């Protein structure tokens, strides 16, 4: 630190604190404001759009500030932009000398406990990344709810997919050596923090983790949170070890293409979650959203979820539960705030209100008379002792502040009641004293007042000052423009007694509040279990209600890789337009080549299939009259046109990257959906690539696939392969316009109707007429169409195609950044590749 002696003691205090929090914006408490100085002030003033001014502190320094009572709004804005905030509070009473101050909390995008700043229906995860000989380890937690998870053995691709899907707000790394990951986190706007302590200190949270490398990986995150947040994190639950293989793989691109939780256009009504989330609580909504992005592969677990949906179809008790749940507060985050000592009395009132509903909640669950629901209900505790404590002690409408009284009910504590009685009688005494002084002095507008600087006083207007006589015993205390303020010995004695009792009452009330809070904290983990049950009930009620509203059916699951969907619908599209139902009947390893005009519904048909599959493997009923589905290990999509300007990738390049992902990682148990691959390049190139991809999937991967295209030449592949089937979306020409029937049938489309679609878009008539003329000429001359690639197919022997599993191993090797690896990293990676090689054998 440079010489700080030229600054005032207060500014020196600030600079010493800032040195320890160089990467954070320091909110420095001065009276009723948080002030920021130097570069913090310059940055914050721009982001917050507040005035940048100057402060004299031995030297002139840049300064800006925000009111203490409105700080949350400003903190939220900074957090949203990815900043860290160090909150500095006064920790000693004002007196002689400099008031002591210290950082009481570090708020970062991943370390938020305040419900006013957090998104209500989403988790707010912070994660850490470690590398072991088994691959990457991702630990993540939401400190507002106490949930903690850990995933082991991830590839770099799987790691980045999961980070995107979880929408991590902050990531903790042990070093900055992996440039690829750093660039990825930057692109995703994820705050990166560096921390190295992996020593196992909190054994409770890592107790479920058996292997040493997992305990250390989990400890990296927990140690960082405990050191940096300065919160009591006893509410964090033991790590839940997530087995990657139990979930269907959905990368971030698939989530985007299918618009499960986020819209491509920013329109929330185009997302699936908007139409299936009928939950009544924030807890249920968060659970539903999380499960939707983590579909299962376990048939037994999925069947149990379906059973729960059926169990909650009883209309009357379900409605009663809904009305109860609508009154339930966010118990999970309430418990988090109470446990982390970031609570106020209103949180305890909300906790009491929620607990008051549990006996009826339990009673209604019992009325379903269903063994599955009974099993859930048996775990519900009514917390009678805690409820009675809160009901007897906390006022129903307490203030937000916890140190200025008004929290504890009369009659709860005898000593507190005694202090309050003295203070109350003091108020009566003051009222009587004022009336007596008016009578004694003859000054009718005399009044008795109070302020924190001078205490109690008698105020007399300027015009009545001559009426003050010496025998009144008035001692001048303060001169105002229009009045004088006085005290008397009697008033001074009363002040000492009244203020003493009020001060003692406030301090005792704060002590009692803390005792009650500490008692509530002892129920933390039991309350978390209750919140999980409430969330599950809420989720199943929502899914049961949605199934009835939209006529969804329970899917059947098979291990035969057969698809039979009767009258399938897209659950979002049908909310906006009348939807034409379609069937999907697919054999194992079958490939559908789908042709038809633009706007005819090819992409919607493919999306419908994918969304129905995701819904089924999330444990939901699906939009169809019947559905028999395989359990997929992954869905790969390339649907719609997009580019990546920030990444320097064209539409065609993005197509190829996403196609490569599918061709590299798909298995025979995967579902691949490609929409018009190859359109972004020359016709020959695009057609050749499309045919090569279809053949590769058919011969090497053997996954089920839908491939929509305008290359009608590809439909000839069905003549050579039994498991390649042509489908088309029906459309008919009527005079000079097109009618799209949106029905998918066997066979191929005879043409693309591109000019007719252009006419529907109201292109100028001269353009349409010229296009029709040119098309006829091209068809007559045989130029530009019917490029038959099949005459060349023998030039590439099937045996020359690298087997899929070997290609996977080669991709791992090609992904290595040798320039960034240490010798130890190289040995770890070599061992990992060796294990992969043994698996392939």
Swiss-Prot record:
According to the UniProt entry, its GO molecular function terms are: ATP binding; ATP-dependent DNA damage sensor activity; damaged DNA binding; mismatched DNA binding
Q: Which GO biological process annotations does it have?
A: mismatch repair
SUPFAM superfamilies from the xrefs? DNA repair protein MutS, domain I (SSF55271), DNA repair protein MutS, domain II (SSF53150), DNA repair protein MutS, domain III (SSF48334), P-loop containing nucleoside triphosphate hydrolases (SSF52540)
Q: Does the keyword Ribonucleoprotein apply?
A: no
Q: What family is it from?
A: Belongs to the DNA mismatch repair MutS family.
Q: What GO terms fall under cellular component here? A: cytosol
Native species of this protein? Answer: Acholeplasma laidlawii (strain PG-8A)
UniProt entry keywords in alphabetical sequence: ATP-binding, DNA damage, DNA repair, DNA-binding, Nucleotide-binding
Against SMART domains, the record matches this protein to:
MUTSac, MUTSd
**Function of the protein:** This protein is involved in the repair of mismatches in DNA. It is possible that it carries out the mismatch recognition step. This protein has a weak ATPase activity.
Please name the NCBIfam families in this protein's record.
Answer: mutS1, PRK05399.1
User: What's the protein called, per UniProt?
Assistant: DNA mismatch repair protein MutS
Positions annotated to bind ATP: 596-603
The family database entries (PROSITE patterns) matched by this protein are listed as: DNA_MISMATCH_REPAIR_2 (PS00486)
